[in-house]
Amino acid sequence: MKGLLSLSVLPVLAYASPMIVDSIHQNAAPILSSTNAKDIPDSYIVVFKKGVTSTSALAHQNWVQDIHTSVESKRMKKRNQFTFKNEAFDGLKHTFDFAGGFLGYSGHFDEEVIEQVRRHPDVEYIERDSEVHTLKAATENGAPWGLARISHRDKLNFGTFNKYIYASQGGEGVDAYVIDTGTNIDHVDFEGRASWGKTIPQGDDDVDGNGHGTHCSGTIAGKKYGVAKKANVYAVKVLRTSGSGTMSDVVKGVQWAAESHLKSVAEAKKGNRKGFKGSVANMSLGGGKSVTLDRVVDQAVAVGMHFAVAAGNDNADACNYSPAGSKNSITVGASTLADERAYFSNFGKCTDIFAPGLNIQSTWIGSKHAVNTISGTSMASPHICGLLAYFLSLQPASDSAFAVAEITPAEMKENMISIASKDLLSDIPSDTPNLLAWNGGGSDDYKKIIGGARENDTTEFSSTLTEKLEKLAEEGLTAIYNELKDAVVA
């Protein structure tokens, strides 16, 4: 089998260890599948090689649909001639043309069709479509505490557990795309700032029939429950009422959100989006490992979207799941009120930061006033998405006289990690960053938040060193104490 795989796919497979090549043939694109996902029978995502143009991709898609129609016509004739059950195939489902960086399509194809597709010279690889779902959470009674936690450095106590300190303009001018089950956009906590963006599953209604997406939206931008209380919310429905969906629908949802963001950027440059400060996105969902989903999320980040994704609730390595394993998003684990890693939270080197995720109260479905308290990394990720919106809103607008260079997603990720509260959480594995999200303690000066956090790190180091020196003195090691103290002063 050596030498049969596309060289461009080999690094991807090395990175995505839970992916397997379950079908290899000479001069044919590999068919990939995840070891920890439930495949959808005869459903595939086809990805084109780099260099394939949009025109060539369209011609290919027309070609494959013609093949599908021909094969289905033959199948129908056989079904009419013989009395046996014969499955029908739907053909082309979604097409992907994402900012020039990702081209492909998905569909429901007969094996005869997919074998012809994989031998086409423009195809890099084919991935079996798989199920995606909300990250299951337990429902319990409780009160919100997550907002208070991200605005305090120290562990919460009776005087601080319900006090959220924040800049009042947090989220203003920022669009938040919630890629989930939808959002109860009429909920009073959104104050009219929530809109329906797009429903991806075919035949589904423009409504959140599950509640999961509404809960995430409330944590991001609700008046009472939100981190960034003035952000705009756009519902991107990729999961059905059951909380489940397909990987291809999620990929299409990410593409739609990124395209919407790029339209807003273009409108802002024309002067038609006054005060626009950028876009963030949240994905509190997961399935198995998907090279395609991770790649598409990274492409969305590359065009300027700030992405937060849930690490997952399997108490396992986040790198083995998607989109948790995407390189350029911020992957979020869940913490508790007692500053512990939540027992369900995934971990590992792909986890970038932790945020409150146990017993989080937020908006819900059923009425304009409904609330619910649930748990999961699904609840932690919206805290980070909200913080992304919050920090973006502290920048001057692009059309302002005080406009500054746009903060890239990579810079924002680095800054958020650099100011996080360090080494406060217990039960954190050695390969996992011990970082808890922090909002700057209510300051509305982003530069001071970033600079002040770094100064605090130096101060904390000096304070710790002084304490150790004092201990030496107490033990009677006066000479050593004086020598070291003089060195510190110098």
UniProtKB/Swiss-Prot annotation:
Main location: secreted
EC code(s) of this entry: 3.4.21.-
Catalytic residues identified in the record: 180 (charge relay system), 212 (charge relay system), 378 (charge relay system)
Region forming the signal peptide: 1-26
Domain Inhibitor I9: 43-134
Gene3D superfamilies, per database record: Peptidase S8 propeptide/proteinase inhibitor I9, Peptidase S8/S53 domain
PANTHER family cross-referenced by the UniProt entry: CEREVISIN-RELATED, PEPTIDASE S8
Protein name stated in the entry: Subtilisin-like protease 8
Species, as recorded: Trichophyton verrucosum (strain HKI 0517)
